């Protein structure tokens, strides 16, 4: 690899980044590596903490007895966005800091993670989400049950189609930001200092929550919606649950396609249509 | 990837480790060095000015922290209604923002702990000696008492009638819930501190430490958003002690044990998780 890098540097003066090779679809060797299980544990713990802090904030806000007594919807949006920032920062080097099955799905489509790893991450994220909301229920049992359990549902006055659209576009914003923040070309432009990768991702989550909390309570994270639905176990939460899987996955798909095929033009590069040098 | 040095040399790791792609940087080789564990007892520290300077820095930082945060709490409590004040979110910002600013200022002097639970967690991870850990904790508690004392000095009557900013378990919650919230909240904070100060992390950030305080401040802010309704959010034994001493009412002292036991358990769990699971330090070969 080091030889390849230096060779690349010689032949392509001015380009100081290398696109990583696509991850193999099936890589059973990963199953025997401790770092794989460490990554799963990290995703589990991160999603657990994410759900605990965010759902506790939601319940705490809903418990308010007078106007302005809670942290406000702005505070809830900060809880989601800020927590993603902190947790992506903490787990970036361990597991890549996905904390969201939609992000994992998008990165899988872009061949950044193998199928085995993608499935493992999603399962760990869903389990972590269930445990995180379980903590909230354990600590604030009565208000949890009476105040909606932090579950995502379509609000009155909005149709399921509107909610689906909101989830698709919201997740597109998030996953597109993830792709931009993790792009090797971006790293080169930032002089390879990835100090700020988690910050725009956290802000993307924050801003999408500002926009769509009134519509669906904002899912854009199937594990988050799933964890709350499992612990709250209310019929309406389950009726709408499909929106919080189909929407985010479609949004991630659109973001992956946009970034890979339009911005990075990987398909065109593969054809070598615009350059005589096939190695570009 | 070829040539990449493995973190853990154990039999199960027979396959080359693939760099997890996501937000991870693509480092080719290890350009960091794990600092050696701090000696348990280091009497030589006691003769060094930097030791006392660090203690003074912790005192001043905790003093300013309590002054700004408790004064913010008092402002919210005395307002005619919540809408006329900065509100609960403003209180959370006061705590988180102040930690960000103070950690930034004192990181190079004392490590910017400002919290006995953080000091305890780092001590368990052998980042500092017992002597230094105890000194920091004492200075943090003294700073907290002085900070809350100044707030009381500004408005003694209002301070006593509005709860003194002390941490107590709110109505409707059990002491067990309060303890659990403190444990998980402190875990979030100390785990973030470990991640932000990790040697490997510094290498990944190309040794540019400009943003380590930001996630720590955010972690404090976020935990306050989540647990202010439950306990007023301690996650900092010095903060709880300072307010309890200056307020000095029975119900504040009744619940006070929660704000030492909870944070210390949370810090221990975070230290265990980071050192054993994430960094696998006990399993590394001694090269």
Swiss-Prot record, chain A:
Subcellular localization is given as: Cell membrane
Its transmembrane ranges are: 39-59, 70-90, 119-139, 161-181, 193-213, 243-263
Q: What induces it?
A: By NaCl and abscisic acid (ABA) treatments.
* Phosphothreonine carried by residues: 279
Arranged from A to Z, the UniProt key words for this protein are: Acetylation, Cell membrane, Membrane, Methylation, Phosphoprotein, Repeat, Transmembrane, Transmembrane helix, Transport
**Chief location of this protein?**
membrane
N6,N6-dimethyllysine is found on: 3
Phosphoserine modified-residue sites: 273, 276
A Pfam family recorded for this sequence: MIP
What topology does the record note for this protein and the membrane? Multi-pass membrane protein
Q: What does this protein do?
A: Water channel required to facilitate the transport of water across cell membrane. May be involved in the osmoregulation in plants under high osmotic stress such as under a high salt condition.
Q: Which NCBIfam families match?
A: MIP
By sequence similarity, the record places it as follows: Belongs to the MIP/aquaporin (TC 1.A.8) family. PIP (TC 1.A.8.11) subfamily.
* Subunit details: Interacts with SYP61 and SYP121 in trafficking vesicles and at the plasma membrane.
Name listed for the protein in its UniProt record: Aquaporin PIP2-7
Identify the species of origin: Arabidopsis thaliana (Mouse-ear cress)
Q: Which gene encodes it?
A: PIP2-7
Swiss-Prot record, chain B:
Where in the cell does this protein reside?
Cell membrane
Write out the topological domains of type Extracellular.
77-92, 155-175, 231-257
Q: Name one GO cellular component term.
A: plasma membrane
Q: Where is this motif: NPA 1?
A: 115-117
Motif NPA 2, which positions? Answer: 236-238
Which keywords does the record carry? Acetylation, Cell membrane, Membrane, Phosphoprotein, Repeat, Transmembrane, Transmembrane helix, Transport
**Annotated segments matching region Disordered:** 1-34
Indicate how the chain sits in the lipid bilayer.
Multi-pass membrane protein
Q: Does the keyword Ion transport apply?
A: no
Q: Identify residues that carry Phosphoserine.
A: 285
- Transmembrane stretches, by residue range? 56-76, 93-113, 134-154, 176-196, 210-230, 258-278
Membrane-side (Cytoplasmic) residue stretches? 1-55, 114-133, 197-209, 279-287
N-acetylmethionine modification, residue list: 1
Pfam families cross-referenced by the UniProt entry? MIP
Instruction: Please tell me whether the keyword Transferase is annotated for this protein.
Output: no
The record's account of tissue expression is:
Predominantly expressed in green siliques. Also expressed above ground, in roots and flower buds.
Q: Name one GO molecular function term.
A: water channel activity
Family the entry assigns? Belongs to the MIP/aquaporin (TC 1.A.8) family. PIP (TC 1.A.8.11) subfamily.
What function does this protein fulfil? Aquaporins facilitate the transport of water and small neutral solutes across cell membranes.
Q: What domain comment accompanies this record?
A: Aquaporins contain two tandem repeats each containing three membrane-spanning domains and a pore-forming loop with the signature motif Asn-Pro-Ala (NPA).
Protein name stated in the entry: Probable aquaporin PIP1-5
Source species of the chain:
Arabidopsis thaliana (Mouse-ear cress)
